[in-house]
Amino acid sequence: GYFMDPTNKHMSSLLLKCGLPGGMMGSMMADLKGVHSGINLILRSKNEPELSIDDLLVMLFDEVEYVWPKLGYPPLVTPFSQYVKNVALMNVMSLIKGEERWTMIDNHTWDMILGKSGRLPGALAPEIIALAKEKGYEFTDEDPQKNYPDQLDEYRKEMTENSWDFGQDDEEL
């Protein structure tokens, strides 16, 4: 928490175009630095010019701008902004390797796409819907809160059994 890469503040204005929150800059740069050498290794093996970290950052922002509407315009707040960034980064890596987009989507992102986190503000792109069907995934429009039943009575019982203080109101539980 105390160290911030000094280059982050110089590049954060690039976030305006793709819409990602500025608070993601540190983790995003760490992700990029983590894959940078691997990407350049792939490019060298294909006799293609290597990318600077700045070039890679611009590619990532362009890909975020591309994937965000295709994923139904999820709100770019935690955790959805990370999902969008992760899909974009995986797409960039896939494209550099000569593969197609959408080959590496993690389970949390699929849960968002399928509606398990609630309805997305926009429509999913037909290619995303087709990919989900191809994988045998099912979409849902159920209330995501049903996945988290009220357990307040269980917590009260546990607190009583352990002689723990209940606090001043239910919010403190």
Predicted regions and their residues:
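Terminal or standalone catalytic/regulatory effector modules within metabolic enzymes
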Residues: 9-173
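A structural-propensity feature for long, helix-poor, extended segments
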Residues: 1-3
